[in-house]
Amino acid sequence: MITLQNVVKEYTSRNNKVLAVDHVDLEIEQGEIFGVVGYSGAGKSTLIRMFNGLELPSAGTVEVDNLLISQIRGSKLRKARQQIGMIFQHFNLLWSRTVAENIAFPLEIAGVRGEKRRFRVNELIRLVGLEGKENAYPAELSGGQKQRVGIARALANNPKVLLCDEATSALDPQTTDEVLELLLDINKRLNLTIIVITHEMHVIRKICNRVAVMENGKVVELGDVLDVFRHPQEKVTQRFVRQVTDSDETEELIHLLLDNYAEGKIVKLLFMSENATQPVISQVAKENDVMLNVLHGNLTQTQNGAYGTLYVQVLGTEDAINASLTQLRQLKVETEVLER
């Protein structure tokens, strides 16, 4: 659906050059929700603007739905952009137009008139849950409602791709979740390919199938969201994962556990979605004659499945403890004995 090959974006100002995007390769599939996460200055917003030709690469190619966006200009590019909707952090609504008129604006530009345009506007208002707000102006709307208008407007011309550039960054947590649920629903209903640019790992965890982590213009890590959360490889990825797993607090907790539970072994267990809800602990304890005390745990849900982390105290003979750890690994539970 979307292919980036060796994409570079370089800016020149007086005596220095800035490499905003540094030789990026990506393949994004039809119908997936793909996340790009990075801190400010990582290059993610520059990258997404090359998907619809708002920025042109200094080198490399950008292909969307078999069309080389990076090489077309003029009317061909304008036509291609009708198939690539975009929503923004600060909504970019026309403040002198009502909700219905804002949604109708791209249809006007595309030459859609009369009853056909009114029908499409009403259809989109229902899709994003803004019934009764048709004649309201942006100043009368909440932040979440404004973003719903932005989403409806972006979908007006039945695009195949929706670009979301920090679309929830200006919203409170509850409204963020409501907008994310709407994007999930739209993705499933329309089989729409959605690209999400964000610095919030909660957004990635909530709706994305795959994620690319950017730093200094490069994609430094790429994979299924569940895999990236389980085993983040790069330091920047580990920092992002800590946003939603409270790893800093867990480090303090580990020291407390090791200090307060001197007997047996303290073991960290990592459960995957297929065994996160199974009675593994009781089964292993019973079959190996050990006592497993659960000290701390959490469960994280992603679009690829759930994974859970448990910290347990294992009490028993040395042989029984080792046998229980072996059985846990056989049951596809990752184990890590914490050293005192």
Curated annotation (Swiss-Prot):
PROSITE patterns in the cross-refs: ABC_TRANSPORTER_1, ABC_TRANSPORTER_2, METN
Signal peptide: none
CC annotations in GO: plasma membrane
SMART domains with a match to the protein in the record: AAA, NIL
Domain ABC transporter: 2-241
Highest taxon of the lineage: Bacteria
Binding locations of ATP: G38, Y39, S40, G41, A42, G43, K44, S45
Subunit (UniProt): The complex is composed of two ATP-binding proteins (MetN), two transmembrane proteins (MetI) and a solute-binding protein (MetQ).
Family label: Belongs to the ABC transporter superfamily. Methionine importer (TC 3.A.1.24) family.
Name recorded for this polypeptide: Methionine import ATP-binding protein MetN 2
Organism, as annotated: Listeria monocytogenes serovar 1/2a (strain ATCC BAA-679 / EGD-e)
